[in-house]
Amino acid sequence: LLLHDHGAHFSIGKEKMVRPFGVEASVLADADDWAEKCYDKQYVGDYLASHGYVVLAVDALFWGERGRKEGVRYDSQQALAANMLQMGMSWGALIAWDDIRSAEFLASLPMVHKEKIGTMGFSMGAHRAWMVSAATDVVKAGAAVCWMNTTDSLMTLTNNQNKGGSAYSMIIPGIRNWMDYPHVASIACPKPMLFINGLRDKLFPVKGVESAFSTMQDVWKSQSVENLLTTKFYDLPHFCSKEIQDDILEFFNQNLK
């Protein structure tokens, strides 16, 4: 289950993970440009599929074919979030719920081994990956690239999480009363999990990442499965390189095949 990023780029969603086919030239060009910008010119879905994995990628609400009929507009994120909150829902929670259902659908397919479902995402997709890994046992292993931190490290004047807009897609109201991001991710224990962040990632302060990694390491260690949690830094900005994708393939080969 491949979960696409946010990137404030809404014209495509699933096409960020799997190279589109049977689409207009403009959509293909859009996807290719994004793959170059964020994924080192390599589609993660195509890469994993070439190594024998069944891949499913679905648009999150507000992206691609689930976007605004009126056209892409950044500020409409807050309108969507506000309307959902007034109906007793939240955008971030709906995305998480959709990802759970996507995992269940993937597991139901006849060509898929339902006991070997993995998930991966970059940026917002990473947030989605550890959320769905924590939320359902349908998912057996998860890889998250460039989205892990602690609230205190993200609560700064310049961090995107405090500017509204895009942040609403990754906020579930009330959850911070009980636990922080690494605690939520730790609900996935004792599953195999891979967390990767960049030392030059301006969105996620290294100090906060280190603290979050330490919290998760303590949880996996408490269950005597510390060997199933891998936390790594790359000397990279907010980026999912081919080398990182090689790590992800190796991780899935070790834990799902």
Language model: regions and residue ranges:
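Mobile cap/lid helix-loop segments that gate and shape the active-site cleft of serine hydrolases
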Residues: 83-86, 94, 101, 141-185, ...
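Alpha/beta-hydrolase fold nucleophile elbow
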Residues: 111-123
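Short beta-strand/loop motif that positions the catalytic acidic residue
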Residues: 188, 195-197
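Acidic catalytic loop of the alpha/beta-hydrolase fold
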Residues: 200-204, 208, 238-239
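Cap/lid segment of the alpha/beta-hydrolase catalytic domain
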Residues: 4-97, 107-108, 154-156
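C-terminal catalytic histidine-bearing segment of alpha/beta-hydrolase fold enzymes
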Residues: 214-257
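Conserved hydrolase catalytic core segment
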Residues: 134-140
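Glycine-rich nucleophile elbow surrounding the catalytic serine of serine-hydrolase chemistry
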Residues: 121-133
